[in-house]
Amino acid sequence: MRKSKGENHMGLLLNTLSPAVLYEEMAKSTYFVDKTAFIGQMLQRIGTNGKYVCITRPRRFGKTVMANMLGAFLTKSAATAKLFAQLKIGRDAEAMQHINQYNVIYIDFSRISSNDYQSYIDNIADALKKDLHKAYPDVDY
């Protein structure tokens, strides 16, 4: 997966390549099922009262793959138009206007280590502050 042109910032949590790399791997696997229509459904929620979504499903149901797919589609950090053009969402011209247009915060909670809850939260907050400061140095945090 390559970085998008013009993107100088790529952080640990903000605009990381992780969702794009992980989704591209999944999309190239033998048993891949195209569920990109979900992206169009999520895009319809932007700016509405239903913009906050909680997806609760049993283990091994594909929640992480869906999160990676959405992050890969929206993130400014990776050029993924070629990948998604081959999938169902590629036929949705309205949805494709959103591809690679957004800053994405991607947190893999299983990769953040800590000894207690407060330091766990502090580690996430510190990493996010660093990324935001790199991306927006003129803003006070």
Feature locations, PLM:
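Phosphate-binding site recognition
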Residues: 2-141
